[in-house]
């Protein structure tokens, strides 16, 4: 499906200091979801998905509970969703999603990462027509009939399904996230990660040498504590 953040998955996970950097990012996602939609997972599909993603990455229950508790506290940090658009080397397009309690720090860091690694930050909205926002669910492989599964999910906003050797990926319109999430849960599918992702409308292929240049920027972005997701138009 040409989505970034999934491409180079194995090498990226090896780079990402695994738990030391991943857990704070997962906790931040839980905290934001809980603050936006309430602390009851049964009534908040985004929180359910954030918790499921954390569990799939072996985040301890105590950490998950603490993140939810922070969201309901009177003195909880005001964490904002921040979105940046830019270009990497060789014209690769990049969308960066952050969660931060200090936007001034975050924008300075993101701009510095782009400028020091052959890229540039663009005005927000510049890449809107190049990507489509989708509700995307990454699940354990499904052993049943995929065509039957599609029929069962179509009324919930299902649009596309793809299964490879590692996982099943289901996507739909971003406005159908809650309904599609409930339908997937009802089917008993095992969730690994879910959220709203930016899918490139026209993925572009790059040579190995070009990808090496582009990855220098992507690596630095993914290592930043405030960055939650990075999407590109790389095929």
UniProtKB/Swiss-Prot annotation:
For molecular function, the Gene Ontology terms on record are: DNA binding
GO BP annotations, alphabetical order: regulation of DNA-templated transcription
Q: Which Gene3D superfamilies match?
A: 1.10.10.200, 3.30.70.980
Keyword DNA-binding belongs to the record: yes
Example GO CC term: the record gives: cytosol
Where does the source fall among the domains of life?
Bacteria
Protein localization: Cytoplasm
Q: Name the UniProt key words of this record, in alphabetical order.
A: Cytoplasm, DNA-binding, Transcription, Transcription regulation
**Which protein family is it in?**
Belongs to the TACO1 family.
Task: Enumerate the HAMAP family for this protein.
Answer: Transcrip_reg_TACO1
Matching entries from PANTHER family are given as:
TRANSCRIPTIONAL REGULATORY PROTEIN YEBC-RELATED (PTHR12532:SF6), TRANSLATIONAL ACTIVATOR OF CYTOCHROME C OXIDASE 1 (PTHR12532)
Q: Please state what the protein is called.
A: Probable transcriptional regulatory protein JJD26997_0557
Q: Which organism is it from?
A: Campylobacter jejuni subsp. doylei (strain ATCC BAA-1458 / RM4099 / 269.97)
């Amino acid at each position: 499906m040409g989505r970034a953040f999934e491409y180079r998955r194995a090498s990226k996970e090896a780079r990402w200091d695994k738990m030391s950097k991943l857990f704070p990012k997962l906790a931040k996602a839980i905290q934001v979801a809980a603050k936006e939609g309430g602390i009851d997972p049964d009534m908040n599909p985004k929180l359910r998905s954030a918790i499921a993603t954390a569990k799939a990455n072996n985040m301890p229950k105590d950490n998950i509970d603490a993140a939810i508790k922070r969201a309901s506290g009177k003195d909880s940090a005001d964490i904002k969703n921040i979105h940046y658009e830019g270009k990497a080397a060789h014209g690769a397009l990049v969308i960066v999603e952050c969660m931060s309690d200090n936007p001034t720090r975050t924008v300075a860091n993101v701009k510095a990462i782009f400028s020091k690694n052959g890229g540039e930050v663009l005005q927000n909205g510049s890449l809107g027509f190049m990507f489509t926002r989708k509700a995307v669910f990454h699940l354990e492989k499904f052993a049943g009939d995929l065509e039957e599964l599609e029929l069962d999910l179509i009324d919930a906003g299902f649009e596309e399904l793809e299964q490879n050797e590692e996982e099943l990926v289901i996507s739909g319109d971003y406005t159908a996230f809650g309904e599609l999430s409930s339908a997937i849960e009802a089917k008993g599918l095992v969730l690994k990660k879910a959220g709203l992702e930016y899918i490139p409308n026209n993925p572009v292929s790059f040579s190995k040498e070009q990808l090496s240049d582009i990855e220098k920027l992507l690596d630095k972005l993914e290592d930043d504590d405030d960055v939650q997701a990075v999407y590109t138009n790389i095929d």
